[in-house]
Swiss-Prot record:
This is Helicase swr1. Residues 842-1007 form the Helicase ATP-binding domain. ATP binds at D855, E856, M857, G858, L859, G860, K861, T862. Keywords: Activator, ATP-binding, Chromatin regulator, DNA-binding, Helicase, Hydrolase, Nucleotide-binding, Nucleus, Transcription, Transcription regulation. Residues 334-408 form the HSA domain. Catalytic component of the SWR1 complex which mediates the ATP-dependent exchange of histone H2A for the H2A variant HZT1 leading to transcriptional regulation of selected genes by chromatin remodeling. It comes from Aspergillus fumigatus (strain ATCC MYA-4609 / CBS 101355 / FGSC A1100 / Af293) (Neosartorya fumigata). A motif (DEAH box) lies at residues 958-961. Component of the SWR1 chromatin-remodeling complex. The keyword Nucleotide-binding applies. One of its GO terms (molecular function) is ATP binding. GO terms for biological process: chromatin remodeling. It catalyses: ATP + H2O = ADP + phosphate + H(+). Gene3D superfamilies: P-loop containing nucleotide triphosphate hydrolases, SWI2/SNF2 ATPases, N-terminal domain, Tandem AAA-ATPase domain.
Amino acid sequence: MQDGSLNGLSHHNDERVNHENEDKSLNTSALGDSPDSANRELIPSESKENGVPTDSIEGPPSKRRKLAGPDNSRRSTPRPPSPPWKKAGVDGPTSFLQDGKRRSSRVNAIPLELQPPSDKRKTRAAQRSTVNKNLSGNGKVVASSPLSMSVSQSGINGKHTGGNLTTGSPRTATPRGASARRRRISRSPPRQTPSRTRSQSSATSAPNDPTSHNARSKRSHSNVTSTPTIGIDELWNDIGGETDLGDEQGQRVPRLRIKVKKPVIGFQHPSHVIPPRKYNSFREWLESGEGRIEDGAVLTPEAALVEARKRCRVLEATEPGGLLSPEVCSAYLPEQQEEPPQQYSHQDHLVAHALYFKKLLDQEHRRHRNTARLLAQWCADAWRKRNKRPEDILREQQEEVRVKRKQLARDLQKMFDLARAEVDRMRLARWEEERKVEDQRALDRAIKQSTMLFEKRRLEILGETGSDFLDSTDAEESGTDATTSDAEEDESNMSSTDSETEDEDEVDDDEGLTAEELRQKYADLPQSSLVSDRESVASDTSESSDGTRTSHILQNIEDINDSQGETPLEQIELDEVDPMLLDDSEDESTDMDDDMGDSDEDGDADGTDSDDESDDGPGLLGFFSSKDRVLNDAHRFDDEGDDPLAVSNHEGGSGFDDDGQSVSVDEDGDEELEDADEVSLVPNGPSNSVSISQSTAEVSPVTETPDEEPDEQAEVVDTDMAAAAPSEGPAPLEASAPLEDLVAIDKRGDAMGECHRQQCSPLVNNLDEQELRQNGGASSEASPGTLATKPSEPESISSFEAPGEKPPQPSESPAPGLKTPIPHLLRGTLREYQHYGLDWLAGLYNNHINGILADEMGLGKTIQTIALLAHLAVEHEVWGPHLVVVPTSVILNWEMEFKKWCPGFKIMTYYGSIEERRQKRKGWTDDTSWNVLITSYQLVLQDQQVLKRRNWHYMVLDEAHNIKNFRSQKWQTLLTFRTRARLLLTGTPLQNNLTELWSLLFFLMPSDGDGTGIEGFADLRNFSEWFRRPVEQILEHGRETMDDETKRVVTKLHTILRPYILRRLKADVEKQMPAKYEHVVYCRLSKRQRFLYDGFMSMAQTKETLASGNYLSIINCLMQLRKVCNHPDLFETRQISTSFVMHHSVATEYASKEQLVRRRLLYEHPLTKLDLDFLNLVPISREDISRRLADDSTRLMAYGPFNILRERQYKRTNWQMMFDGSTVQSTLEALENDARKRRMAELERCLYFESKRHGRRPVYGTSLVEFLTADSKQKPTLGGRPQTQSLAEWLSNRSSILASMILSIEERSQAMDGYVRRFACVTPAAVASGITEAALTPIETRYLTEKERFPPYDPFHEAQMRLSIAFPDKRLLQYDCGKLQRLDKLLRDLKAGGHRALIFTQMTKMLDILEQFLNIHGHRYLRLDGTTKVEQRQILTDRFNNDDRILVFILSSRSGGLGINLTGADTVIFYDLDWNPAMDKQCQDRCHRIGQTRDVHIYRFVSEHTIESNILRKANQKRMLDDVVIQEGEFTTDYFTKLDVRDMIGEEAEAQDEASAAMDRVLSSRVATGGSRVFEQAEDKEDIDAAKNAQKEMEQADNDDFGDRSISHTPGQVGTPLATGPQEGETPGAQLITTPQIHGVDETVDVEPQPGHIDDYLLRFMEWNMKDEPLVLPPDKTKKKSKKGKEHRLSKRRR
């Protein structure tokens, strides 16, 4: 027994026996459990150590295997060791150092030399011998026994390997799948007991990977444990108990990964904190000097001894052979030198050639191998083709069929995908068509609503109520809201005949009655009116019968009575309603055309859909929420004094509310106002009851006389009264006249022709127009009195003829056609059109409608607004609070206007600093403190939280184009204010596009509570889609090329906007307004401008920027170009010209050498040479001083004080003392005595110099010499000619004229000073300093007199300065810019003609240049820009208007174009053009407004052949859009009474406005000579391409439309698919198709049926298959996803 082993074997034999036992045990395990081999590793087994059985439970894998297992001989219980990797009692150190690194002994093997001597320690050999002893001692392991088992095995670190060790038998090999499954199971062990630990897993694991035998043999010492084998009975018992475990764990268990943060151990003691290093590196320690001994320090004996030893060691090391010797130390080695490059020798050539040859051989070998491989393949293929077996042929056929089947499947899949895409495209096209139809229906409803509102307002202006008319039209459109049965719903559907014809159960008693019988039947109805009769009379006989038209009107009356809860009339079945009954015309070119949008066929095709849609909302332009439509909510302002005036009802229960509006019951039973009445424009003023009673009196003679002759009434019905021309005579239409007179009047219109009769409007329009012509014609003749009216006055503003007439005087009674009197609070006189504007605004307020007052600037929108607020205070007793938001520049202007026109209002101007505004807000909740608050847009944004707390009654926004962008903060903030009514004031409602107009309209019409908003304007997409086509055509091709469809769309837009926009022009309402002339002045670029412009455009960076498409970069480039056009100094400042200054000239480079030479050669010590002058031995050298000066110098001499100091110093000095250095004290005294001697010598020297310097005295002195000197130049005047001078010379010297002609240098320099200043501009290329000093040497300088060295006047100084530095000439400011040159000429002409001008520009720096320009020319001017304070603006405007000496007022177009009255000027000059032409229009209206007495001329400066030409073109396009949409819409009060037959039938006067004329002058007309070539020259290439593409798209669209109306066959196909698909629920099959039926002449042609195409069948099948799938709509690219709240999320990339 050796080393404790059982058999005394060596270590080598022990290892061999251990391997054999291990292999045998593995074979046994493989044989014994082949079906469950994969699960056996998971089965807990028992092991016996020293005869004691223990449970071996697999646990989590350990990091490293222990080298020495625990000693379990003393432990009798199977308790696992703790902690997991080691026992609690650790044998040996817990850590050790290995290779300089600290390692833990828990996971690393402790080296033998570090392990302490102990009885428990076991070496590796002892460990292996212990294992062998246990194995052999138990006697249960037999190599040949198949039942022998080894220890349970697991891979290293708990991972099982892929197989077992084999002994050559095939039965012992574990299948690969089983091993893989064993690996998967081992990673996630199943049910673990709480006692399982990592130590058990490591103790019972062994390697079993056959592929890594070498690695396993190397790790065998650490992998083999001391666990003995298990008994067979106990093993199979355990296996039986866990048999089903492998089945449960057959599938892979997901691996869980839990990430936890590394725990942070807190500091429990101050010593735990590691102190920072004092030095970060050895170099820092060396540099710090710590530990170094200073040179002057005193060392202790011990330190001195240590230092001596170190030095001795260093000396020894420097000896030969030492470490620091030159032979050993590397410091003495010479620096390595770079070796020269070796020459390319023959050997290098040989090697390179050999390598190249090797490369060629390799390529050849590869080529040969590839060729051989291909040849072998070819041979194999040929052999297979020659000798094919039947099974090979069958296999090839099967393979070919399989490939074809796969390809066919792919082709079918691709075909079905294409079919699916085509079906989706067809479905999407159908969806788009349906959406277009829905949009068109919404547009038709909007037009119908606007038409009804317009007609009602028109009737009100003409003196009629119009309530019945509006009720009838409303009933026609949307039916009755209160539908209690299906029959009533069918009755209310006025636009479809399908529902009427399908309802066969109801019997219409009135269907067979004539018009006369119906009148007799319904003659006693209380609400019969003249309007109803006129509508029945004006019915079109070609479309429907007379009885039907009359019954239609009576049905409306019945609906009104039904809605009031009265006894309903007998229900009338209506047949074929004319949708154009209430329209003014069917022509496409009139303003009231095509109100219904489609014809009767379209209305019939819509069916009940239009009825359903008409009940959805109140209409397009209802500018208030649905809350206001409830009757109870309509009176919610009663407490504010805003309750409508009651109207006297006719015969008691007339079914009208207080406002004269009909009441209907909706589906819920609530009473609401009718939709059309809700948005009506009828002004219910104080005289409303009187007017209605008068209208009732007028109606009664006609409606209450059933005894009229039937023939006359039939004649009225049969005669088409709509085309009757206005009567030429002045005979008025009396309300009491019989019906025959009406027929006689209408018969006079038969001369207009049959075409007028066919295209007519209702009779009410003709009668109204006739009354207008009779009452307010050119003669302005008043009509005679009638039964119910007083003698009328001219009620049309067209009667205002003479421009020199005085404006109408205010009166308490309103003018004819006006229901609103001028409030007595208003001071001053309203003009007639302003009174009409007040009436229009009052009508909007009475009907709870918001509007836009868009009068041209200068017509008094401010006065009309003030009059409206005064009207509310007088008539409705509503004093406020009102909010007026204006630009900052006109706050004080509004305050002055309020105090001037309505001093009864209390005004608060809300502006100033934060503290001032806080003071103004104190006590402002009291309504009596102020009535109107005037503030600016900026302050509204700043103090929005405070302003939102108030409930404002009326909110007025001046210059409302500030909220044209609905995305801006201003728009969104003001939209949330709580107001009763809103009014927008703007002179430019349309500036750039229709979206801005939509923003204004939506601001007046906020959306409902559900978020959908009122139909129409609340949907920007629909609004833009409706009117997109005319906008594109106008901007791209001009207004002259609009087609008929575009004109119809524009007319529809006018119809929608007309009730809500009031727009009057100065030329229409102000006849005395002076004319306005616009001029475009083209200015050439100067040479400098052209150089800068072309240079900037030719830059590569500019071209890249313009081609990049970046909006901001392009705008920046355009702004730079505009700066060049305005003035080159804005782009690049003209530099001050200076010469290149050399620091040192060539002559002065040798100054230092010259000084050195002179000093060495000419230097003389002053004491080596006798100076007689210093010794006063040269008496005549002192004659330059006077005797008095010499006496003063002697008197001030310091000889006496110096002598006293010398005596004192002499006494203090010890002249006998010698130097004694024995002691410190004696040394210091000797040094001090030497210093005294030096001071004594210095005093003596000063005393000597003082005596010599002040002892100089002159012999005569300058005073005596000057006294005795006589001036030889001053001779007497009468002196004779000198004998030495000739007579001619003497006479020339005496002549003053000749003396003036011959000037000296100084005089000539002074005379030429102006020329030098103006023309000395060429500076030398370079200048150098020191030339004068080099030219005048010091020796020569001493011979120059003082007078010559310092002359009093230098004649060349000015020329020298001008030629050394040249400032730019002031005149270059003008000559560098072509615009300023043209402006100079224009200002001189204006000043000569007595005109005054306003100059507008966008750039503030340009204002600075204009100031310099005006100062140069001496023009008086004023300036106003954004930095001007609010208080100063009004002062400046008043000063300019009152002082005629001021020629020019220069302003910024952004700040000086808002609300400023500058009528003192009659000329407007736009120095540069604005991107937005509306801004220029506002600027020019600063002087062209009320109060201007002279014609206004407007000049626009445009630099030719530059970007400004394109800006002008774009501005003209925007002006044309404004002209077409706004100006031609005739949104005036005249339009209510100005309609005639010519307007109705579409005869428009083709007149060009000023914008079109300017466009023709600049770009010519498209129809002129040159055509497209002229456009190509004027426009950019991008614009030309865009126009051509748009033209192609239009042509293609026309072709498509034409193709839709014709028969189309798909080329290349046999037939056309069926129009109707298969029935729902049926699978489409192969069907025969015939020629489609076409509406035309039926011809008997025999057509044989032809089979359809397979593609058509596929499309039908796919469409049937996809019928239940939802349609995927394309994403809306215009909508941007909001990132609000998602800023923290990062977008993930798609992989």
